[in-house]
UniProtKB/Swiss-Prot annotation:
The lineage of its organism: Eukaryota, Metazoa, Chordata, Craniata, Vertebrata. FAD binds at residues 185, 187, 198, 250, 253, 285, 298. This is ERO1-like protein alpha. SUPFAM superfamilies: ERO1-like. Oxidoreductase involved in disulfide bond formation in the endoplasmic reticulum. Efficiently reoxidizes P4HB/PDI, the enzyme catalyzing protein disulfide formation, in order to allow P4HB to sustain additional rounds of disulfide formation. Following P4HB reoxidation, passes its electrons to molecular oxygen via FAD, leading to the production of reactive oxygen species (ROS) in the cell. Required for the folding of immunoglobulins.
Amino acid sequence: MSSYGSVLFLFSLLVWGTIAQEAPASAAQRCFCQVTGYLDDCTCDVETIDRFNNHGLFPKLQQLVASDYFRYYKVNLKKSCPFWEDNSHCGVRDCAVNPCSSDEVPGFKPPGFKYTEEANHVHEDVDDCEKEKRLSAVDESLSVETQEAMLKWNRHDDSSDNFCEVDDEESPDAEYVDLLKNPERFTGYKGADTWRIWNSIYEENCFKPKAVQRPLNPLTSSRGENEGNMFYNWLDGLCVEKRAFYRLISGLHASINIHLCATYLLKDTWMDKIWGHNVAEFQKRFDATLTHGEGPKRLRNLYFIYLIELRAISKVLPFFERSNFLLYTGNETKDKETKKILLDVLQDARDFPLHFDENSLFSGDKKEAAKLKEDFRQHFRNISKIMDCVGCFKCRLWGKLQTQGLGTALKILFSEKQIENLSESNQPSAFHLTRQEIVALFNAFGRISTSVQELENFRKLLEKV
């Protein structure tokens, strides 16, 4: 080729390269541009997690959490906020209840009435009232058989130290909730109240000094593009434990947002409600252009919390595979079937090839590591308390469950020696999980697993935009 031809060829490559670089990214690329490759502080990549979860673990988890043992969660949704005085609840129609008269609603009867046969067969009398219920209302009705079984379940529980604030199950305000009747989805709960909740979580409990502003924080004045640079320079300079704490909270936040976008109220009439994927809402929360580059980082943190909870589940297998451990609901046949599914899930988790190495946490000077671990635990306990400040009852339900689930995962990760010393005998051991912790752990991981699976759905939908 002549020198002139060579110059022309190189010039053509340069022009086409420039055009390619300037071509606008697609909607899918803007959301998922960083959702690939290896994760920070881990030896695992996004693609391995996608294959493992979406084509293997996800359907088994869904079957598990739909079983009787895992679908009922006892929770107190009436506790007051311990950090600020705020008696307000979600005021949007779909997030608030228009009260019925006292003779129509079981909730206004004496405390024991709601568990009677009469209380659970009032649907014909309150049809008009039911139409006024908001999306965030928690359906607390239980069948007669379930009510009777609940009385027996608690005998199999103990208590233990943990990473989150636990509701007093003996409180008259603590009630069993059927999670299948109360799915986590869009409720219309948004605005200043939600910002205040998440601001308290990030600003006061993520080891962050006041001088460093979190990007896109609506409750603080913006410092422009440099705001993000300052924050991530600070984050990169933290020890791995503090960095992990922030990424866990960010991953949980991302997961919750994905659920709301995936089961969004697309149509609402008095006759019908249609739920489905809201692509525009997903873009608003995760598109790199619309979030100044923050959205894809949040999605990467979703995979980080997935690895943490997956590692915890893999490590707790010895606790559940003991022959004397029962998933007790009173139905022996179903209980055995549920335990079989559970052990299958746990074995799959153990077989995952690229687990997070929890030994990288709290591994320095013993005295400093012990203090850092306690700070870690206290910060997380504060976050679990903040969930009592959420004004939407359905959001509060799932917030409390998911923080307890993550707290239980952390408890497992830092109880390795106690788990190794478990025995088949009925003697008390240093490690134990209550029924509430077990239900929260697997439902919380089920939510994270669902989020990872939903990303595949959103990726396909965005490719059509």
